Amino acid sequence: MKARLPPLLLLPLFLPGLAIAAPSGRDIVLHGNANGALPCAACHGANGTGNPAIGAPALAGLPAGQITAALANMAQGHGGTTLMRSIAAALSPAEAAAVAAYFAALPKP
């Protein structure tokens, strides 16, 4: 008698190939995300030096936890500008953490 595996038991073998990798922090900073978050670099710069003329603070070298907390706060509608609140709301927690890690790893201006 041959043993047969139910087809559902084979599914995990194929799932890794179907997984879609989340964009890196650098990708989000440079290109935004699929949920409508604009590229951070448009205002904060790819190197995180900010743009005082438009009120975009420097983010390079800040602690990742500080950036993540600020994004979470803005995603809840508190602080920041209307534009930043909408961008923060379009980031998943993992994407916000990736963006924060990217900026935290950059040297302070």
Task: Locate each region found by the language model.
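Positively charged n-region of N-terminal signal peptides that target proteins for export
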Residues: 1-4
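Extracytoplasmic/secreted proteins, especially bacterial periplasmic and envelope-associated proteins
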Residues: 24-28, 66, 83-86, 98
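Electrostatic cytochrome c docking/interface patches
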Residues: 16-34, 47, 109
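The canonical Cys-X-X-Cys-His
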Residues: 37-46, 99
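Bacterial N-terminal signal peptides
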Residues: 7-17
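N-terminal, post-signal-peptide region of Sec/Tat-exported proteins
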Residues: 45-68
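Axial heme c-ligation environment in periplasmic c-type cytochrome domains
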Residues: 51-58, 74-107
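Sequence context surrounding c-type heme c attachment/ligation sites in exported
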Residues: 26-41, 64-68
